[in-house]
Amino acid sequence: MTPLQLSEQGKIFHSQIRHLLQQLESNLAELRGGSDYAQRKIKIAAAHSLSLGLLPSIISQMPPLFTWAIEAIDVDEAVDKLREGQSDCIFSFHDEDLLEAPFDHIRLFESQLFPVCASDEHGEALFDLVQPHFPLLNYSRNSYMGRLINRTLTRHSELSFSTFFVSSMSELLKQVALDGCGIAWLPEYAIQQEIRSGQLVVLNRDELVIPIQAYAYRMNTRMNPVAERFWRELRELEIVLS
């Protein structure tokens, strides 16, 4: 028996009702003279790598008007939370479906996934993309970055690899790469310090560098005033990733 599911219109209505209830709760808290935490709270669901690589920069550039409730989750789960009204907005990657109604979006930045590995005592790469059966540190197959990397590997059938480690989290893959366990495709914003220090080496093959784009998404229905203010502030930001 197929469980009942909301239609797309039903999901939009559900999201609208959630925002109205949140605003009502905020108004009641203000009337009671209670804590302003609920009144200023921004709920964001973010892809794992963006929660570490992007959110600290955004929070530091925002005026002190908000309190933050951040959940780092898989991309697909973040989209579900947005559709169901459980998040004011999500920080995720390029998704054609989310670039159209009933959603609104802000493009935050562009970056790249570089194939990298640890260096030896002479600063040389421990592994090479042309060696047979190089150990691959990959993202989960159904994750956004996993899909990008697997498509690239399929196009470049000359690459010979053996998957050694799989995770949905960039930071975990980076640590395993730093430990000298294999080659990983990692986002530029997550490895700048390690590249500068020589701990990680970029394996220079331009055709294997993968472009990525990060976006903020929301439903295009009206949110509560605090969330609307956050969205306006976010549009004005110039994102700088260190």
UniProtKB/Swiss-Prot annotation:
What is the induction note for this entry?
Transcription decreases during mid-log phase and is maximal during stationary phase.
Q: For this UniProt entry, which residues form the secretion signal?
A: none
The answer, when asked if Transcription regulation is one of the entry's keywords, is: yes
Q: Which family does it belong to?
A: Belongs to the LysR transcriptional regulatory family.
What is this protein's name? HTH domain-truncated transcriptional regulator QseD
Q: Tell me the Pfam families matching this sequence.
A: LysR_substrate
Keywords assigned by UniProt? Transcription, Transcription regulation
The terms under GO molecular function for this entry are: transcription cis-regulatory region binding
Q: Which InterPro entries match?
A: LysR_subst-bd (IPR005119)
Task: Give yes or no: UniProt keyword Transcription.
Answer: yes
Q: What does this protein do?
A: Represses EHEC virulence expression. Down-regulates expression of LEE (locus of enterocyte effacement) and iraD genes, and alters AE (attaching and effacing) lesion formation. May regulate transcription through interactions with another HTH DNA-binding protein.
Q: What biological process terms from GO does the record include?
A: regulation of DNA-templated transcription
